[in-house]
Regions:
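Extended, charge-rich low-complexity interaction segments
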Residues: 180-232
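Adenosine ribonucleotide-centric catalytic and binding domains
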Residues: 9-73
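Conserved beta-strand segments of the P-loop GTPase G domain that flank and frequently precede/overlap
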Residues: 125-129, 161-163
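Well-ordered, non-membrane alpha-helical segments in soluble/globular domains
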Residues: 99-111, 134-149, 202
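Acidic/glycine-enriched edge-of-secondary-structure segments
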Residues: 77-105, 128-130
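Membrane-proximal basic amphipathic "stem/tether" segments
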Residues: 222-282
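Structural alpha-beta junctions
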Residues: 27, 119, 142-166, 177-185
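Short acidic, S/G/P-rich loop/turn micro-motifs used as interaction or catalytic elements
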Residues: 15, 95-102, 129-138, 167-168
Length: 282
């Protein structure tokens, strides 16, 4: 088992970050946590260039409209970089009104990641490939890792775990681990009416991470439960006696915006699932 002092997600989706979070390996939100990445190389190149053009208003185009549990999410895509933003805008909170606040939020997350990459000594990056894309080559993975290492010259260790979909897997399996680049196959694709969904089953991914790595200062199970309980307490306090049925509740929306909680399409009831937000509350 290898030990790191910082782990972060490069994408492709929120499933990678959620796998780290549920093990206590990550608490604060970072740029790639709630976005859709077009590729591993696109993510590392974005890190290398300091996220230039990441959220340029002129490049954002409405890409999809998703109906989730009574909530209508408006998905925007950056047509220059290929990154998608699925969790930021809705019919009730359109981009024309929310763009500045969302941009400021991502600026905080970008600054947070930059500080960590400049100061940490043992860094792990995780990329969970899209379940509908094939595995990329070892050369592409090694090249991506080289870009990351160039960005962190002070670090003693910068490793990359690349996980891709293989429906035959009953348990995540390491295929190769050379010079800090580890390739893992796992089954995490899910289906709805015979079609692959964008939501991943993280059980095999989380199981592999739990058995393979440790993070200095990771939250224990007791701390995770306490963290979750505190978020529910703050939610109840902010809502008074109101009962929450949908994400579109006005007071819940404001609380989520303030703390950057992702609750799209979920019913919020005690014990439902952990709530995650930026650790500084900004």
């Amino acid at each position: 088992m290898k030990t790191y002092d910082f782990a972060f997600s490069l994408g492709f989706s929120c499933a990678a970050s959620e796998s780290l979070r549920e093990l206590g390996f990550q608490k604060e939100s970072l740029p790639f946590d709630w976005t859709g990445a077009p590729s591993l190389r696109a993510s590392v190149d974005m890190v290398a260039c300091g996220f230039a053009g990441w959220f340029d208003r002129d490049a954002l185009r409405l890409w999809d409209v998703r109906h989730e549990g009574g909530f209508i999410a408006r998905v925007y895509k950056n047509m220059k970089t290929g990154f998608g933003f699925s969790h930021e805008f809705s019919n009730a909170d359109p981009i024309e009104r929310s763009y500045d606040a969302v941009r400021e939020k991502y600026e905080r997350r970008i600054s947070r990641l930059g500080r960590e990459l400049k100061t940490r000594r043992r860094i792990l990056a995780l990329y969970l490939e899209s379940p509908v894309k094939p595995r990329i080559s070892d050369g592409e993975i090694s090249a991506a890792l080289a870009v990351l290492r160039a960005k962190c010259p002070q670090a003693e260790v910068v490793d990359l775990v690349y996980i891709y979909e293989d429906e035959t897997c009953k348990k995540a399996e390491v295929l190769s681990s050379v010079a800090g680049a580890t390739v893992v196959r796992a089954h995490y694709r899910t289906y709805l009416d015979g079609r692959p969904m964008h939501i991943c089953d993280r059980s095999q991914v989380a199981g592999f991470l739990r058995e393979s790595i440790s993070i200095d200062g990771a939250l224990t199970e007791a701390q995770l439960r306490a963290f979750d309980a505190e978020k529910r307490r703050r939610l109840r306090a902010s809502l008074g006696t109101n009962r929450v049925n949908r994400w579109v509740n006005k007071k819940l929306k404001q609380w989520c915006r303030d703390l950057e909680v992702y609750l799209i399409g979920q019913k919020l009831i005690p014990g439902d699932r952990p709530l995650w937000f930026d650790g500084d509350g900004k």
